[in-house]
Regions:
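FAD-site-proximal beta/loop scaffold in flavoenzymes
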Residues: 155-170, 257-330
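Gly/Ala-rich phosphate-binding loop of Rossmann-like dinucleotide-binding domains
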Residues: 19, 23, 187, 191-192
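N-terminal Rossmann-fold NAD(P) dinucleotide-binding loop
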Residues: 15, 183-184
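Beta1/beta-strand and adjacent pyrophosphate-binding region of the FAD-binding site
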Residues: 1-12, 170-180
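Short hydrophobic core segments
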Residues: 7-9, 113, 132-143, 176-177, ...
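Flexible, glycine-rich terminal cap/loop adjacent to redox cofactors
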Residues: 7-14, 20-35, 40, 47, ...
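Hydrophobic "anchor" residues
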Residues: 48, 121, 271, 298, ...
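Glycine-rich flavin
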Residues: 2-4, 20-27, 32-171, 198, ...
Length: 459
């Protein structure tokens, strides 16, 4: 008889949620984790960055409160205390996961996992000792790690993992290589605190994978905050320049150099499955990611993979949804989440949240569309908060009238995009989504204005 019915490798959002769901459905479960419960998300990603952004927003709002009668003197940011706060939040949430495991009678096996065969996992402790476990099924949820391309001198730059370890002082200046989600959130954090920030992006705009207007609007807002932005810029090398680091790059066929006390490499992440399989044991790969079928099964029978290690979309909530769907199918339960509808958020100011297709993506697929848009200059909550130019765009199929996409750039966009995702998952038409009464004053009432514009264009 096997030791467990399911062994999950990795206690990040995909792994721990899958384990809890499997235990609830009656499986005997173990989770292997070599670091803190919660994985990258809780300890080196989503939660630490949002904690830092929460702290920097308090500083920014207090420092800039004179226009509404709030006057502060001698306000300063203590970086050691900010990072201590970040660690406390992560530790509290990580401890919460371990408590959930105990309640669900899930064994947490501390150590590094090695898959020695289908249904066989060896767990090595830090002291070098190892134990072998057998199981009916294995679920790989080992996530991803920061990428560092082979650019001369880039080893001098920090990754997001290293930056989040903390620093006891505020950098005078920081150069961020990469204008995607990770780079933009760190740019927001450091700009809020008064650090001189430069962002270097290789594509023609910030957030190149998103709607063009989002990146363009964000660049304007960041520049107003004093952030220097270079696009169409290719980094050639990084080198020490006295106490600073110099980043040399080409931009519009010109050689440029910017220097900073620190440099952050934020140009993506790669699937992490290094050393996961014993010699002679392996699975089919899709580039550097583990290849899976429609049920998340790898080429090795009874071995499954979910989340960043196998998915094109590297988001915590995608890993969670995939993990739950995988174990539900293993248990013969109908999974309930539409995995094709994926919201994505960026926690800059104003926030950005998207779901579904952009107008350009729909047209590339040959889908006839109409787009409704509302610029929130007259939205009362936006006028009060004054985060910069905000807007909402909604994309609908021109013939079926169903909503197929949304792009929000406004305060609390991340808290509203779930409702739009619900509309997409249930194939609601623009008229059906417009029926709901939305509160006033609120940021969300701009959704009604965008929907009314969309319905008018649909005719």
């Amino acid at each position: 008889m096997a030791d467990y019915q399911l062994i999950v490798i990795g206690a990040g959002p995909g792994g721990y949620e899958a384990a809890l769901r499997a235990a609830k459905l009656g499986k005997k479960v173990a989770v292997v984790e070599r670091r803190e419960a919660g994985g990258t998300c809780l300890n080196r990603g989503c939660i630490p960055t949002k904690t830092l952004l929460h702290a920097s927003a308090i500083y920014r709002d207090a420092k800039n409160g004179a226009h509404c009668g709030i006057h502060t003197e001698d306000i300063h940011a203590d970086m050691a205390e900010i990072f201590a706060y970040k660690r406390a939040v992560s530790q509290k949430l990580s401890a919460g996961i371990e408590s959930l495991f105990k309640t669900a009678k899930i064994d947490l096996l501390r150590g590094t996992a090695l898959i020695t065969g289908s249904g066989c996992v060896r767990v090595a402790d830090a002291d070098g000792s190892a134990n072998d476990y057998t199981c009916d099924d294995i679920l790989i949820a080992t996530g991803s790690v920061p990428s560092r391309p082979p650019i001369p001198g880039l080893e001098l730059a920090m990754t997001s993992d290293e930056l989040l370890e903390g620093c006891d002082h505020l950098y005078r200046s920081i150069v961020i290589i990469g204008g995607g989600v990770i780079g933009i959130e760190f740019a927001t954090f450091y700009a809020d605190l008064g650090c001189a920030v430069t962002v270097i992006e290789g594509m023609d705009r910030l957030l190149p994978s998103m709607d063009k207007e989002l990146g363009q609007n964000l660049a304007l807002i960041l520049k107003k905050q004093g952030v220097k932005v270079f696009t169409n810029a290719m980094v050639q090398r990084v080198e020490q320049a006295g106490e600073d680091l110099a980043v040399h790059f080409t931009c519009k066929e010109k050689e440029e150099t910017v220097s900073g006390e620190a440099v952050l490499c934020a140009i993506g992440r790669r699937a992490y499955c290094d050393g996961l399989f014993a010699d002679g044991v392996g699975v089919k790969m899709n580039g550097r990611s583990i290849a899976v079928d429609g049920n998340f099964e790898t080429s090795l029978p009874h071995v499954y993979a979910i989340g960043d290690v196998s998915s094109k979309i590297q988001l915590a909530h995608v890993a969670t949804a995939q993990g739950i769907a995988c174990v539900e199918r293993l248990c013969g339960v109908q999974d309930h989440t539409d995995l094709s509808v994926v919201p994505s958020c960026i926690y800059c100011r104003p926030e950005i949240a998207v779901v579904g297709l952009t107008e350009a993506e729909a047209k590339e697929k040959g889908i006839p569309v109409k787009v409704g848009k509302h610029v929130m200059f007259g939205n009362a909550k936006t006028v009060i908060a004054d985060p910069g130019r905000c807007f909402m765009k909604l994309v609908a199929h021109a013939e079926t009238r169903e909503l197929i996409g949304a792009q929000l750039m406004c305060e609390h966009a991340s808290d509203m995009i779930g409702g739009v995702a619900q509309a997409l998952a249930n194939h609601l038409t623009a008229e059906q989504f417009c029926r709901a009464m939305r509160p006033h004053p609120s940021f969300e009432e701009a959704m009604t204005a965008a929907l009314e514009d969309l319905c008018e264009k649909l005719g």
